Amino acid sequence: MTRPPAPAPKPQRGRPRDPERSRRLLEAAQRHFNEHGLERANVDAIAADAGVSKTTVYNNFGSKEGLFQAVVGDRSAKVVAGVTSAVALDPNQPEKALLAIGARFLALTRGDDALGALRSVYGVAGAQPDVCREFYRQGPERVKGELAAYLRSAHSARTLKVRNPLQAADLFLSMFLGSGHIRGLLKLEMADSREDRALLREAVRVFMEAYGA
């Protein structure tokens, strides 16, 4: 008796196997989500912009919301990649380490990837809690955790006196999220490099004054 043919395997969801096609699709989706937001963005227009079929989008991401989550995840990865591990810095030179960490974080908060990701996530706050939670876990929480780990090592080396490393890390990073960052989110004129350097030096001075051993 002839056996019936085996059913075709179901397509696996995730990024398309072709890296170039994946890049085009995520970049096109990012542009459309930036311009129109999640609710008004159109999958047909995204697919046409990326040069793929609408079927490809749904086969790989399941829905427009799934594609949006992939875009946010891609941006989060790029953002975190811009901040090298703080743990690798010398705990015996906290001022130098904080200047390096602060400079990278300041550049990150002014960058298009981070600002675009924040705008996109703010636009779905409440409606897409899983997307927001994952963005926070992969982005802000991870950066804060790495800085806290460095502060623990500096505390152990007795070059800083930090009783609550997570709180101290939060306070340090928050000093870079003032009016300059808000202007960036609102697409207004950004602070120039001289203002940013002055902010960096003052943030490190204030932190060392509070936590220096």
Q: Where are the regions a protein language model picked out?
A:
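Helix-loop "lid/cap" segments that line or gate small-molecule binding pockets
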Residues: A103-R110, L118-G126, F207-A210
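Hydrophobic alpha-helical connector segments
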Residues: A70, V83-G116, K161, P165-F172
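Amphipathic alpha-helical packing segments from all-alpha helical-bundle domains
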Residues: K96, A107-L108, G116, S120, ...
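Short, basic, alpha-helical segments at the C-terminal edge of helix-turn-helix-like DNA-binding modules
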Residues: G73-V79
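Short coil/turn segments at alpha/beta junctions that flank glycine-rich nucleotide-binding fingerprints
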Residues: E35-E39, Q128, A157-R158
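Hydrophobic/aromatic-rich alpha-helical bundle segments in the mid-to-C-terminal region
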Residues: R133, H155-R205
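Basic, helix-initiating cap at the start of DNA-binding domains
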Residues: M1-V52, N59-N60, E65-G66
